[in-house]
Amino acid sequence: MSLATTNSVAEIRARNKELIEEVLKVYPEKTAKRRAKHLNVHQAGKSDCGVKSNIKSIPGVMTIRGCAYAGSKGVVWGPIKDMVHISHGPVGCGQYSWGSRRNYYVGTTGIDSFVTLQFTSDFQEKDIVFGGDKKLDKILDEIQELFPLNNGITIQSECPVGLIGDDIEAVSRAKSKEYGGKTIVPVRCEGFRGVSQSLGHHIANDAVRDWIFGHIEAEGKPKFEPTPYDVAIIGDYNIGGDAWSSRILLEEMGLRVIAQWSGDGSLAELEATPKAKLNILHCYRSMNYISRHMEEKFGIPWCEYNFFGPSKIADSLRRIAGYFDDKIKEGAERVIEKYQPLVDAVIAKYRPRLEGKTVMLYVGGLRPRHVIGAYEDLGMDVIGTGYEFGHNDDYQRTAQHYVKDSTLIYDDVNGYEFERFVEKLQPDLVGSGIKEKYVFQKMSVPFRQMHSWDYSGPYHGYDGFAIFARDMDMAVNSPIWKRTKAPWKEAPSAKLQAAE
């Protein structure tokens, strides 16, 4: 049993505050003062977690954040399957992020779907000196010739494009006209913009607003027959099939899903979304901007949902149903009742094996709070959590609805801090990303990737909860931990004792 579960709330709070002070001692005074604003111990009743967020990382620290290009191309636009997404700039940005997110989709790759292909303009020195617009023009022609069934193209700008002032908007307009009105979207997501991938999400949302919705209004399309029960899934990237498992529940309760943004999504679905009666928002951080725009422009309400774990699934189904008539409300209750035997079986099997185990999380802009309920459904206790690129409203939601008193909170935590926190709090499981995975596994700490589900999933929905429970049990109770132990679980060697 971890040390964190053996003390009172007051003792845990005091210990966590001491831990923060201890971690900050290694920094120069100015750096320590800045980092102190990002670390805190949550106090019950507070409206937020008491940390600063969405601020530039300190130069020289090993931040775990990404850039605006990653937020736009890697998160929002990349999963749109029937569009070609050009990484416009040097080859490295696209190459080293190629296929790193498991955005499942239906289609024939290279024919009518292009998610897992890497398109790059491969900038060279001469392109920096003389500009890359002519090269971009040629690339667009090549794409049209080689992939004639693509339904649109996005141009995802990398850093040099913004620095040299290329006019990708003019190229996009000219080529769109040349191709008979084809959708070509320039996205100014150069990596130097903003403080993290979060601004890339915002820029991508704005590109949808200006280059997709703007053209729909002007051209009077799409032609779409609405029903009273049309909804759009917003901010689900179909990691491991998450959006599909969510869609099943929505359709079983009587709703019609007319669009998925953007996992397994298409250009036609983006264009159809202004006809929805409700936008249901999964990843608030990356897609709240376009959801708010559609509410203001088209009068479409939106609500957040959380399909991690049965408790949150039931809450979300009822919240969504509240926007519709009794038919949908009855459908929600029917779905909850249908899956209750599955939930009972999963909890009966895995909760005894996971009860009381402690977890520390550090993920992107949503999962540090959304997955907490699923862990609690299994009897596990989240003792620390934080966001790579969360904003203040994310920490408000976390404080008001998810974390317990005395939980350790860390914003934009760096490699050093996270390792020290784990060493001191000694969790039974860490959930974070690929960069952290092997560090903690080498420390003999059970670990699960909470960005890509460690090549498992889906984790959304009732079926996903069964997979989630199995994977957490597999990580925590693997036989390998009988052969290797975390440093704090090993008896000190005679040599170390002599040295002391």
UniProtKB/Swiss-Prot annotation:
One GO term of the biological process aspect: nitrogen fixation
UniProt EC number: 1.18.6.1
Keywords, ordered alphabetically: ATP-binding, Iron, Iron-sulfur, Metal-binding, Molybdenum, Nitrogen fixation, Nucleotide-binding, Oxidoreductase
Family: Belongs to the NifD/NifK/NifE/NifN family.
GO MF terms held by the record: ATP binding; iron-sulfur cluster binding; metal ion binding; nitrogenase activity
The protein's name in its UniProt record: Nitrogenase molybdenum-iron protein alpha chain
Organism: Bradyrhizobium diazoefficiens (strain JCM 10833 / BCRC 13528 / IAM 13628 / NBRC 14792 / USDA 110)
Annotated binding of [8Fe-7S] cluster, by residue: 67, 93, 159
Amino-acid positions noted as binding [7Fe-Mo-9S-C-homocitryl] cluster in the UniProt annotation, renumbered to this chain: 283, 451
Subunit structure: Tetramer of two alpha and two beta chains. Forms complex with the iron protein (nitrogenase component 2).
InterPro entries recorded: Nase/OxRdtase_comp1, Nase_comp1_asu, Nase_comp1_CS, Nase_Mo-Fe_asu
Catalytic activity field: N2 + 8 reduced [2Fe-2S]-[ferredoxin] + 16 ATP + 16 H2O = H2 + 8 oxidized [2Fe-2S]-[ferredoxin] + 2 NH4(+) + 16 ADP + 16 phosphate + 6 H(+)
Stored Gene3D superfamilies: Nitrogenase molybdenum iron protein domain
SUPFAM superfamilies: Helical backbone' metal receptor
GO cellular component terms, A-Z: molybdenum-iron nitrogenase complex
Record note on cofactor: Binds 1 [8Fe-7S] cluster per heterodimer.
Cofactor(s) the protein needs: [8Fe-7S] cluster; [7Fe-Mo-9S-C-homocitryl] cluster
Transmembrane portions of the chain: none
Function: This molybdenum-iron protein is part of the nitrogenase complex that catalyzes the key enzymatic reactions in nitrogen fixation.
Top-level EC class: oxidoreductase
Any Pfam family: Oxidored_nitro
